[in-house]
Regions:
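Acidic/aromatic-lined carbohydrate-recognition and catalytic surfaces
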Residues: 2-202, 206, 219-291, 295
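Hydrophobic residues within beta-strands of alpha/beta enzymes
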Residues: 56, 212-214
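Short, compositionally biased segments
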Residues: 274, 336-338
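Aromatic- and acid-rich polysaccharide-binding/catalytic face
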Residues: 297-313
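Outer-membrane beta-barrel transmembrane domain signature of Gram-negative proteins
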Residues: 310-322
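Glycoside hydrolase catalytic-domain groove-lining segments
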Residues: 322-335
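Conserved small/polar residues in nucleotide/adenosyl-binding loops
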Residues: 339-346, 350
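Hydrophobic alpha-helical segments, chiefly the membrane-spanning helices
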Residues: 350-357
């Protein structure tokens, strides 16, 4: 384990925290190659301290082909060599902890890069293999499987399915991707997938990371028992009961995060110094957040709301409803954080923070 400094204090420090997001590839370029790097962040630690922030949130720094700004992760337990090394990451944690700034990192569990070793193994292994079961593959429709399995769009394009070439060179199965074709979705019913992400959480926690921001937190678990979904948008089907949409906001996703919480609880009790880990998510769908906050789920510590910024100027009623939903959470004793009226997905003309305590 790297030799880093723990920060003592209140385990609920994040209730009042100011968190500063850093996109490492553009924040500071120390070696002058045109790409931001970890060394550049280390060089700016004194500047970050002057901002009086409590934590930084590092957007993906993992090896990636950058089909989606680094959210297509090729290796979850490494640093992209274009921006640094694991040793430099350890140094960054050490320097930030010296000035009592904690560190959150992005974790991207819904999908990997198509260059991830698991997906490459799935392409080589063929139909029905354990390697393919880590992802979501389906046969196509039509006489030769040439028609995609369902009329499902993705967030980034007209279809959520892409066909692969089988090991023998023939056109083959299709894989699901809710985002870019370079981002195949994991199969979270596969125990190997679940175990490997636990391994990833421990890997970064042992290196001193103080918390994780979950990308696409509401989309991990999927249910195709009633057939593959066909839809023209990526919105939750309003006709379905809460927690039963086949793609998003399913009740089962909280089982995953409760398992993660068990891992983090191990760090809460180690040693005599503060090592508590924080788990937070991006608020996309209100039912996901209301279950977490109002029903008192103990899996995710807090969330930030980008939808607030998207609706504030165009739909005051939706903004009011969003605030009321989180106020119900506040009345149940949970911390509710509204942050990022603008984030990495949106234009950055305004950033603010509002805490309801």
């Amino acid at each position: 384990m790297p030799n880093y400094k723990f920060i003592a204090g209140d385990k609920k420090w994040w209730r009042q925290a100011v968190v500063y997001q850093i996109y490492p590839r553009s924040f500071a370029d120390l070696n002058g190659d045109g790409i931001g790097d970890l060394a550049g962040i280390i060089d700016r630690v004194s500047y970050l301290k002057l901002l009086s922030i409590d934590a930084v949130w590092l957007s993906p720094f993992y090896p990636s082909e950058l089909a989606d700004g680094g959210y297509d992760v090729a290796d979850y337990r490494n640093v992209d060599p274009r921006i640094g090394t694991l040793e430099e990451f350890d140094k960054l944690i050490e320097e930030l902890h010296k000035v009592e700034i904690r560190v959150f990192v992005d974790i991207v569990p819904n999908h990997s890069s198509d260059q991830h070793e698991w997906f490459q193994a799935a392409l080589k292994a063929g139909r029905g293999s354990p390697e393919r079961d880590r992802y979501i593959f389906h046969d196509g429709l039509g006489e030769n499987g040439e028609i995609r399995p369902s009329e499902l769009v993705s967030h980034f394009g007209p279809t959520g399915w892409t066909r692969v070439t089988e090991p023998d060179g023939t056109p083959g199965q299709w894989y699901l991707h809710l985002f870019a074709p370079e981002q195949p979705d994991f199969n979270w019913d596969n125990q190997e997938v679940r175990d490997d992400f636990i391994k990833t959480l421990r890997f970064w926690s042992d290196r001193g990371v103080d918390g994780f921001r979950i990308d696409v937190a509401h989309a991990l678990t999927k249910d195709f028992s009633d057939g593959l979904p066909a839809r023209s948008t990526m919105d939750i089907d309003p006709k379905l009961p809460d927690g039963s949409d086949p793609l998003f906001d399913r009740d089962e996703v909280h089982e995953i995060y409760r398992e993660w919480r068990k891992v983090f609880n191990e760090y809460d009790i180690k040693g005599k110094v503060e090592q508590a880990k924080v788990l937070f998510s991006q608020d996309v769908e209100s039912t996901f957040v209301e279950q977490m906050l109002v029903e008192g789920e103990s899996d995710i510590d807090l969330q930030f709301n980008i939808m607030l910024g998207e609706t504030m100027q165009i739909d005051p009623q939706k903004t009011f409803s969003a605030v009321k939903a989180r106020q119900r959470g506040k009345n149940k004793g949970r911390s509710v954080s509204y942050t990022h009226l603008r984030a990495h997905e949106t234009g950055r003309n305004l950033v603010c923070r509002l805490l309801l305590e």
